[in-house]
Amino acid sequence: MRELSTINYLKKEYKELNLHPLSNIGCTVGLINNDDLFHWRISLLGPKDSVYAGGLYFLNADFDENYPDAPPNIRFITKIYHLNISPIDGEISLSTLCYWVPKTPMKEVLYHIFIL
């Protein structure tokens, strides 16, 4: 039963991000496998007026059956040099993820990653 509620929540979040993308920060979201809502591919443009400007960065977001009560696992798959991103595995050190508040919208999470 828990997995079904997670799937419904992920459907809602995914649909919202695709109907109303974060275009002001150049972010798009897709599924890694067309029939698997638990694994997303995210593309993010580097912020203007930053050392990342002009760059296109890819991230993977993995959700488990406890989402949204548990945070997603989000990692950069594009190599990026940043104090809050592990050069080894792309793990993001972000308070939004470390101190997760259930039902935090993915739009908010992605925005916080963008402004790192």
Q: At which residue positions do the language-model features occur?
A:
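UBC/E2-like fold recognition across ubiquitin and ubiquitin-like conjugation systems
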Residues: 1-56, 60-116
